[in-house]
């Protein structure tokens, strides 16, 4: 529909003017599972007729990766990166006009106005805050300026004989601190 068609029959789409379309993809080096996922992305893109190549021919060590992304390397067309919102999900920290970690560089007036509402004193009202976040979610879904592909999760096993353990221990969100931990028995609970 956008005019990118396979005009020479090689199974890959060309630019609208008929020239070769190649997309450079940057991804961080992490673990074997990530390397497999990156290769799978390349296969899926090829299946829909896109010639996507790894920028530098391989995944990139994390520090170098983020240096290149933050520098807006013109050779990178699309990238896969990780991020988290921490305890405050305010999108201003990742998608604001001056946000240091706005790696997508996507900013427009509509999104900025929603972020301003989320960051306003009006958002102290819980119902308004929920309304503003729902508006942001609808906006982000509609614009699709980034596409989440993975959600991190962790499981922490703690024996029942340990009291006051908290997975966020030693963070400002924790209600417990390390000095409060107790072990109630010499033998593990079963």
Segments predicted by a language model, with ranges:
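Detector for C-terminal structural segments
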Residues: 1, 33-43, 67-190
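Ligand/substrate-recognition segments at binding pockets and active sites
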Residues: 4-82
């Amino acid at each position: 529909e956008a005019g990118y068609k396979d005009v020479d029959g090689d199974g890959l789409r060309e630019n609208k003017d008929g020239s070769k379309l190649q997309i450079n993809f940057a991804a961080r080096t992490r673990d074997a599972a990530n390397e497999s996922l990156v290769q799978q992305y390349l296969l899926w893109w090829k299946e829909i007729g896109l010639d996507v190549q790894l920028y530098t021919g391989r995944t990139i060590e994390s520090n170098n990766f983020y240096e290149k992304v933050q520098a807006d390397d013109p050779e990178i067309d699309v990238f896969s990166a990780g991020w988290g919102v921490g305890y405050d999900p305010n999108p201003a920290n990742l998608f604001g006009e001056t946000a240091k970690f706005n790696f997508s560089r996507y900013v427009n007036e509509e999104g900025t106005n929603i972020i301003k509402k989320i960051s306003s004193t009006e958002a102290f009202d819980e119902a308004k805050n929920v309304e503003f976040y729902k508006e942001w979610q609808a906006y982000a879904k509609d614009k699709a300026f980034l596409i989440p592909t993975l959600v991190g999760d962790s499981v922490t096993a703690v024996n029942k004989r340990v009291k006051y353990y908290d997975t966020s221990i030693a963070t400002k969100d924790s209600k417990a601190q390390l000095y409060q931990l107790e072990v109630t028995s010499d033998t593990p609970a079963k």
